[in-house]
Amino acid sequence: MPKSLNNFLKKINIKPQTKNLANYTTYKIGNISKLFLTPKNIKEAENIFKAAIEEKIKLFILGGGSNILVNDEREIDFPIIYTGYLNKIEIHENKIVGECGADFESLCKIALDNSLSGLEFIYGLPGTLGGAVWMNARCFGNEISEILKKITFIDDKGKTICKEFKKEDFKYKISPFQNKNFFILKIELNLKKDNKKIIEEKMNKNKQARINRGHYLFPSGGSTFKNNKAFLKPSGQIIEECKLKGLSIGGATVSKYHGNFIININNATSKDIKSLIEKVKAEVYLKTGLLLEEEVLYIGFK
């Protein structure tokens, strides 16, 4: 074990667990991590992140496990920080304050119980609040940056900061936290009071749309490719017009319900999924001259 990693583990005083990451991703694909860390509260998370900065340790923050593809051909040799226990949610009038690991279903339920509108667009997704902020989650014409108020995070110097953010600080699927050694801890959302029945109807409508698109039939990472306004069409439509629905490699297939979903239909490997993503990109480029950009993150690949 490298000296820096050994020092890191001594500083955090949390015993790493051995976990199969396939059990923590929506693709149901992954390999063993022997450095799986589960902070039980924000204080423990702060200690982990600050120790990682001090020792220059690469980490991966794992939330709901969507939008990622973990290499299943090799053991993951860097610490995985699982945020599943960082899930506290508080209500303050029309504001929700959630820890980074708060899942969408719990957030939406609490919002509905308190007649608060603004989270309907994420209902039915498997992600967490921290991941949603990191990637500026977007669907049905709404994005998380529209309802953001404050974010508490650790910067690359190990300082805990609470800062207000505006929608203009974010772009399509881009946040100020990407490509930076920052760690999101808590998020404050600014919601609006509305009729409870109307909120519930919107939530159910959005979930039904996901059911109709086959989102829950097979394991997947969610949308595979970002949309690009310059293409004048959603990526899923472009893939469908290239007649790529049903295209398969190994156990991976382009969903027959939605062109932008690559699904694990029959014990797919990470190589199957990655190869199919590359095949779809190549075919679309060959037929249209358009270069699709992945939304999925590759973890543990060289």
UniProtKB/Swiss-Prot annotation:
Pathway: Cell wall biogenesis; peptidoglycan biosynthesis. One of its GO terms (biological process) is regulation of cell shape. InterPro entries: FAD-bd_PCMH, FAD-bd_PCMH-like_sf, FAD-bd_PCMH_sub1, FAD-bd_PCMH_sub2, MurB, MurB_C, MurB_C_sf, Oxid_FAD_bind_N. Its EC number is 1.3.1.98. Signal peptide: none annotated. Keywords: Cell cycle, Cell division, Cell shape, Cell wall biogenesis/degradation, Cytoplasm, FAD, Flavoprotein, NADP, Oxidoreductase, Peptidoglycan synthesis. Cell wall formation. Belongs to the MurB family. This is UDP-N-acetylenolpyruvoylglucosamine reductase. The gene is murB.
